[in-house]
Amino acid sequence: MRRALVPLVAALVLIAPESAAIAIGPPDPGDVKPQIVWKKIPFGATRKRQMARYSERHYGERTYHLTDPQVVVEHYTDGTSFDSAWNHFAANGTHLGEKPGVCAHFLIDTDGTIYQLVNLRIRCRHAIGMNWTAIGIEHVGTSADAILGDRDMMRASLRLTVWLMSRYGISWGNVIGHAETLQSPFHEELYDDWRCMTHADFNRGEMRIFRRRLKRVAGRLDVPIGAGPHWVDSGC
């Protein structure tokens, strides 16, 4: 009986590596998810209706739902206080004559703590032309240089962004700065007066640094990075 087991054991040893190789694939998004603290802003029925109407006016679709996001937009708050930014997003104030007020899905504090403010199934008004398909990440700070030079904030931001890439299949080329939105192939704005509006936070040069680091972190975590940036002429 013992002699009969020897060929069987040898066969299993030969089969095991091939089976293991077949099982290798992208990591489970939960395996790369960083620690996130929930600190929800009010986003009840009224704000959802406002977001749905905003979407109808600007994107031609009456919904507040964010489905299959294709882009991550990086921002900074142009301030030094987490509480000030959170309160501004929570207030749901009128912006450019319209509601809902501005917000972002995530807000990263200066100590590197990641706060989630809004459910990822809900559209947030954080970047003109992009809210229909983009997740917004805000960083507490007054310049991209300061954030890029802050180890705690960068570690948190890169891990968060890589997790979102893994979860939604977003390519590294569609991780963009607010200042790059007009050249994104996903930019869509029905209001002519708004079509060329954007902000200056995280410009092309700053995002080259960010994306270079992002690829390194994604590589270490075995997260597929997809295609690089594909810019379009906005005509602006």
Where are these regions (language model features)?
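Bacterial N-terminal signal peptides
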Residues: 7-16
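Basic/polar, cationic surfaces and motifs that engage anionic cell-wall
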Residues: 24-47, 143-236
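Soluble periplasmic/extracytoplasmic beta-strand elements of cell-envelope proteins
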Residues: 73, 105, 136-138, 176
